[in-house]
Amino acid sequence: MDEASHLPNGSLKNMEFTPVGFIKSKRNTTQTQVVSPTKVPNANNGDENEGPVKKRQRRSIDDTIDSTRLFSEASQFDDSFPEIKANIPPSPRSGNVDKSRKRNLIDDLKKDVPMSQPLKEQEVREHQMKKERFDRALESKLLGKRHITYANSDISNKELYINEIKSLKHEIKELRKEKNDTLNNYDTLEEETDDLKNRLQALEKELDAKNKIVNSRKVDDHSGCIEEREQMERKLAELERKLKTVKDQVLELENNSDVQSLKLRSKEDELKNLMNELNELKSNAEEKDTQLEFKKNELRKRTNELNELKIKSDEMDLQLKQKQNESKRLKDELNELETKFSENGSQSSAKENELKMLKNKIAELEEEISTKNSQLIAKEGKLASLMAQLTQLESKLNQRDSQLGSREEELKKTNDKLQKDIRIAREETVSKDERIIDLQKKVKQLENDLFVIKKTHSESKTITDNELESKDKLIKILENDLKVAQEKYSKMEKELKEREFNYKISESKLEDEKTTLNEKISNLAAENSQLKNKIEDNSTATHHMKENYEKQLESLRKDIEEYKESAKDSEDKIEELKIRIAENSAKVSEKRSKDIKQKDEQISDLTQNLKLQEDEISSLKSIIDRYKKDFNQLKSEQSNIQHDLNLQILNLENKLIESEDELKSLRDSQKIEIENWKRKYNNLSLENDRLLTEKESASDKEREISILNRKLDEMDKEKWNLQESKEKYKRELQKVITANDRLRREKEELNENSNNIRIMEDKMTRIKKNYLSEITSLQEENRRLEERLILNERRKDNDSTMQLNDIISYYKLKYHSEVRHNNDLKVINDYLNKVLALGTRRLRLDTRKGEHSLNISLPDDDELDRDYYNSHVYTRYHDYEYPLRFNLNRRGPYFERRLSFKTVALLVLACVRMKRIAFYRRSDDNRLRILRDRIESSSGRISW
């Protein structure tokens, strides 16, 4: 540690409180050994060679660190650790912190603090966890209730849809009745028109016959003619009246037939719309069925969760039984200890306190067992009620499913009946145009023939395509084989090339050896020539200097003879070398011949292999050519087939065109006949009009006008009624669409909520596992400590007081470390609870806001205030969109500021405190280790 950690307390009065705590005065952290105050000083520190020092008696029996001093230092009660007492109110200012409130553990430590406080805190924590678990179970129950309400609302919506379907069925029945009435009226009107046409034809025939009779009579008897003329005029007037009435009836019938045909068309359109609506309702019902199945799956999941809770409750029962067994064991141990204490009267106050603590612990465990038993009974009752509710819901769902199935069957039956009625009506309307139907049948037959031909063409095409594909595959296989053979051929060529290359290299090496030998021979020949030149030069010199150098000549002759001998030797050597070269060349030639023979054999083998491969390739090529020929033949056959099919198609198309021309000609002839009849009818009507213009009265016209006006009013009323029904259907459609959207949104929200709940459950299970592991570790540690206590009590020696002080100091250190750890866990737990509460609150806000936007009524158990539905409060939890950062205006709350010295100083201070805490933690661990080793050494056991 440096000097920064030795700051006095007075210099930090005006500084703010941080989560790490306030700085305290540093304890003595010198690395020198702690000398016991009772140790006798050594007089012979410098004399190492002298004998061992005489043992002297200590002033006190205790040779350890004073246990009361151990816990009076700052490391045990530092302000950085969370305080145990929660009832002290926080100070408003950090500078005026009361010193008595900084350390609230010292007073408890000076008193006789019971040894089982960590276990108590652990039990309190378990109780809190159980409470939280119970709260979450209630929340899950509420969510289940909401799911059930949503399911009930879906079922009610389904019932509404079923009622709408019933009303639509009733309307369809009424429309069917109206349709049948209109069809019957139409048939009666057609019969009346046919009767009237027959009457007209009979009257025309009578007129023609009477005209012939009048023309054939003689003009002699004028009186008879006049009478006959009068009679004829009367008959004509009667006939004209009849014609007029018939004409009016025909016009009325035509108008009625047009109106009824329009009504029929409109009602057919309405029927189609109703059928579409029925299909939509069926699809909606299927969607609702899927939703119901999804909710059934959710209910099954909930039942599985309930079963898991049952299993957990059984596990808790087992744990309770284990705790009961532990409590019995502790009671037995207590009784044994009490008997021992009664035997050994001299017992310390500390052990009595321990006994009291054990008794208190046993009482608390028994209370916990009783509370847990009551909780288990209550939970079992709740589970039974939930299971009963689940069975009721499942029975209701099954009933609703059966009802829906029966209603769907009824709808299907009605739909089939409607379709049958529509088919019958269409068949009745189609039966009037027999010629057109016959022609259409012919066209259909031709189309069927065309279709059959196309089918056969497509089948033959598919067969040929398959054959072509198979042959293509064979060609590909053969091509692959060709490629493999070519690769083998290329490999063989490569090997041949490599061998040729090696042969060339060997030849080049032999040529190099030849050149080196020739160079040696040439060098020897040059030396010989040089010697000969020298001899010639010497001979020339001797001729010039015979007289002066006779002695030299003799010497030179001797030298020449020596040189001759050397030359002979060199020539002999050259000959020997030539012989060797010849022998070597013979050997090399033999080797070469052998190599050449081997290579020739290899080349012959390779050529044979190549020939075989070429034969295979040629055979493969022939097979490929054959397949290609077959392929071309098939292609030509296919082209011929296609040509034939095209010709057939053209013939059929020509036939179709001819049949269409026949149809057109028939229709034209029918139109011409109809126009001729119309012309005749118009001529007759014009004649009748001319005859009856004088006799027509205004009253008849007024009556006709009034009748037509009434009919128009009735048609307008029917039109308005139809428009109103159309608007009703549109409204109902919009309602169905909105309900579908709402259900889809609710489904998405429920999925999101279920995912969030699963995440929270996973977190809770992790926290629970951690707490359970900590509890088990603490229980094991407590058991080990109790075993050690029992062992230490059995071994009572002269140094029992010293050992007891060591044990007390060790357990006090252990206790305070556990207190600090528990306080840290409390802080973490509070933080996690706050985070969970905020998360759940946020989820509730989102769900409430969604329900508010969908206009869904709130349930009765709404625990949130109305302030949380405010948009301002809702935006509080979202990221704020900060404005632009201007250089001039930096005083706003959302603009960047410069870092103040205060924040930096607080950060540095927190780092220093964390360093100090880490140092104190290490020193405490060292103390614990030293004390544990001392206790084990004193008890006679050494753990290596």
Swiss-Prot record:
Record localization: Nucleus; Cytoplasm, Cytoskeleton, Microtubule organizing center, Spindle pole body
Residues carrying Phosphoserine: S60, S80, S529
Alphabetically ordered keywords of this record: Coiled coil, Cytoplasm, Cytoskeleton, Nucleus, Phosphoprotein
The processes (GO biological process) annotated in the record are: gamma-tubulin complex localization to nuclear side of mitotic spindle pole body; karyogamy involved in conjugation with cellular fusion; mitotic spindle elongation; positive regulation of microtubule nucleation; protein localization to mitotic spindle pole body; protein-containing complex assembly; regulation of microtubule nucleation
Show the segment(s) annotated as Calmodulin-binding.
900-927
Q: Which residues are connected by disulfide bridges in this protein?
A: none
- Region feature (Disordered): 23-110
Q: Which residues form a coiled coil?
A: 164-791
Which residue stretches does the UniProt record annotate as biased composition, category Basic and acidic residues?
Answer: 96-110
Tell me yes or no: is Coiled coil among this UniProt entry's keywords. yes
Q: Which residues carry this modification: Phosphothreonine?
A: T18, T64, T68
The protein's predominant localisation is nucleus
Where on the tree of life does the source sit, at the highest rank? Eukaryota
Specify residue ranges for compositional bias: Polar residues.
Answer: 28-46, 67-78
Pfam families documented for this protein: Spc110_C
Short sequence motif named Nuclear localization signal, residue ranges: 54-59, 726-731, 742-747
Q: Name one GO molecular function term.
A: structural constituent of cytoskeleton
What the protein does comes down to: Component of the spindle pole body (SPB) required for the proper execution of spindle pole body (SPB) duplication. Potential role in cross-linking filaments or anchoring other molecules. It is essential for growth.
Subunit composition and interactions? Homodimer. Component of the SPC110 complex containing at least CMD1, SPC29 and SCP110. Interacts with SPC97 and SPC98.
Family recorded in the similarity comment: Belongs to the SPC110 family.
Remarks, miscellaneous: Present with 279 molecules/cell in log phase SD medium.
| Annotated protein name in UniProt | Spindle pole body component 110
Q: Which organism is it from?
A: Saccharomyces cerevisiae (strain ATCC 204508 / S288c)
